[in-house]
């Protein structure tokens, strides 16, 4: 605080030479320290007492020995003399306020030597060191710094309190010695070991700090970058660098040839080889008999690589459903389709017919669509996938039109109306029976109309669709025939 105040007071002076040599330029401005002698002596006494108390408090830290107390008293006396000589209370106005006399400098040097010999912390925390005296100008401040000659020469021109900031941190090792056990992150905290003698050399040589791990640890192309570290560093630093390099270097070595060989034809050829054919088992090739109207496929040749001997044997032993899984057509297991696929190109005539026969022995029914054949096969197997979702019903049906017909019993919908009397019915066969009563003995016509109505019900069984009737029922009967019925 005192050093900062003195620096602020001495800064507005014109020049150091004018302060020490000429009194005319020194007395032009306003200077707060040039007051009455009583106030000047009071301020000097206050500063001296504060410095003496500071010296005593610093001496009390040394353990309370008699030699330390004597050294502290000498330092306090030297400081009082220094302050009294520096501020020159009642002196001639021509003398500089901050010029240090040779006697005060010698006294301060003696006090510093006594304090250095008695205090174990004098090398690091001694306040009163030998000041660096500037010849003629009187502008040099008291030097703090370390106890060695090199440190005192380097820091002689620094203030007392600021000089400790720039000193080496290695001096603190005498106060707080490190534990002998090595820390796992020792090389991160400090690059040098506290026990090595070259610690100060490494720190002064401009080595990287503890947060500078080095630019090489990111460089994955140089996994041996730890060899560039100084030899005086802790051995754990080399291990850390190696551990940092090893994961990235390992990945670099493992995948070094990936960009060159993974996408080349030589490296990917094993995917298409017979040994690696299992990778493409889920994607079956399109069989030549899949499309009935297509020409014979060139893949069916003996020299084709896709249909080699190995895959052909696998396809022959696998079920037809898996072989035709990705053929683009609905799977059909009827005897006609199996025969057409077995014949290959020779079975094109069977495929053009589009006939799907029931394979159950003794049935022999034939359908033109695979969906109709599947619906027929449910009669044989007893499968009923269509369930009524009406409340407390849950009935199951084989065909969707049967389910739609059943739902009309719940809703009460009557889709079919009589064209003569406009009477409505839920089912088309009921309407056909009713129309027979209007036709009067037209058994053949009535039976034909009933069959057509039943087919209409089966084909157009979607709910909400408009009622469909046969053309005969849509035509109004002749008046004479109706009169005869009446």
From Swiss-Prot:
Its main location: nucleus. InterPro entries: Znf_C2H2_sf (IPR036236), Znf_C2H2_type (IPR013087). Keywords: DNA-binding, Metal-binding, Nucleus, Repeat, Transcription, Transcription regulation, Zinc, Zinc-finger. A motif (9aaTAD) lies at residues 208-216. It is found in: Nucleus. The keyword Cell division does not apply. GO terms for biological process: dorsal/ventral pattern formation; embryonic limb morphogenesis; proximal/distal pattern formation. PROSITE patterns: ZINC_FINGER_C2H2_1, ZINC_FINGER_C2H2_2. Residues 136-149, 439-451 have a biased composition (Gly residues). GO terms for cellular component: nucleus. A zinc finger (C2H2-type) spans 356-380, 386-410, 416-438. One of its GO terms (molecular function) is zinc ion binding. Residues 16-25, 36-46, 294-305 have a biased composition (Low complexity). CDD domains: SP8_N. Residues 1-46, 136-157, 294-324, 432-486 are annotated as: Disordered. Transcription factor which plays a key role in limb development. Positively regulates FGF8 expression in the apical ectodermal ridge (AER) and contributes to limb outgrowth in embryos. The 9aaTAD motif is a transactivation domain present in a large number of yeast and animal transcription factors. Belongs to the Sp1 C2H2-type zinc-finger protein family. This is Transcription factor Sp8. The lineage of its organism: Eukaryota, Metazoa, Chordata, Craniata, Vertebrata.
């Amino acid at each position: 605080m005192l050093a900062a105040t003195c620096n602020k007071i001495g800064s507005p002076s014109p020049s150091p030479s004018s302060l020490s040599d000429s009194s005319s330029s020194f007395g032009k401005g306003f200077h707060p320290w040039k007051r009455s002698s009583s106030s000047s002596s009071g301020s000097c006494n206050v500063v001296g007492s504060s410095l003496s108390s500071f010296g005593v408090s610093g001496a009390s830290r040394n353990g309370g020995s008699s030699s330390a107390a004597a050294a502290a008293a000498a330092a306090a006396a030297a400081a009082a003399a220094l302050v009294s000589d520096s501020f020159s209370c009642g002196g001639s106005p021509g003398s500089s306020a901050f010029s240090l006399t040779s006697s005060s400098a010698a006294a301060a040097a003696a006090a510093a030597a006594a304090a250095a010999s008695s205090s174990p912390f004098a090398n690091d925390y001694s306040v009163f060191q030998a000041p660096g005296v500037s010849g003629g100008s009187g502008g040099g401040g008291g030097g703090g710094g370390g106890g060695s000659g090199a440190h005192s020469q380097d820091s002689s021109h620094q203030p007392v309190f600021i000089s400790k900031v720039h000193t080496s941190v290695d001096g603190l090792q005498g106060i707080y010695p490190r534990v002998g056990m090595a820390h796992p992150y020792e090389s991160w905290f400090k690059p040098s070991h506290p026990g090595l003698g070259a610690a100060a050399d490494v720190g002064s040589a401009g080595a990287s700090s503890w947060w500078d791990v080095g630019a090489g640890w990111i460089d994955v192309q140089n996994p041996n970058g730890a060899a560039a570290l100084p030899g005086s560093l802790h051995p754990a630093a080399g291990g850390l660098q190696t551990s940092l390099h090893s994961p990235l270097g390992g990945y670099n070595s493992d995948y070094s040839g990936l960009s060159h060989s993974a996408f080349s034809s030589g490296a990917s050829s094993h995917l298409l080889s017979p040994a690696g054919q299992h990778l493409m088992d889920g994607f079956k090739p399109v069989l030549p008999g899949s499309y009935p109207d297509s020409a014979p496929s060139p893949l069916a040749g003996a020299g084709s690589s896709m249909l080699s001997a190995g895959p052909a044997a696998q396809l022959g032993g696998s079920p037809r459903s898996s072989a035709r899984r990705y053929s683009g057509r609905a799977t059909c297991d009827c005897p006609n389709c199996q025969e057409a696929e077995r014949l290959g190109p020779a079975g094109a005539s069977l495929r053009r017919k589009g006939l799907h026969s029931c394979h159950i022995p003794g049935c022999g029914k034939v359908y033109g669509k695979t969906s109709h054949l599947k619906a027929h096969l449910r009669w044989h197997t007893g499968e009923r996938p269509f369930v009524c979702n009406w409340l407390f019903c849950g009935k199951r049906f084989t065909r969707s039109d049967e389910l739609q017909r059943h739902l009309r019993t719940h809703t009460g919908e009557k889709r079919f109306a009589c064209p003569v009397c406009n009477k409505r019915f839920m089912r088309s066969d009921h309407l056909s029976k009713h129309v027979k009563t209007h036709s009067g003995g037209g058994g053949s016509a009535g039976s034909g109309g009933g069959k057509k109505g039943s087919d209409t019900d089966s084909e157009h069984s979607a709910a909400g669709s408009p009622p469909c009737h046969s053309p005969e029922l849509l035509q109004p009967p002749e008046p004479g025939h109706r009169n005869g019925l009446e």
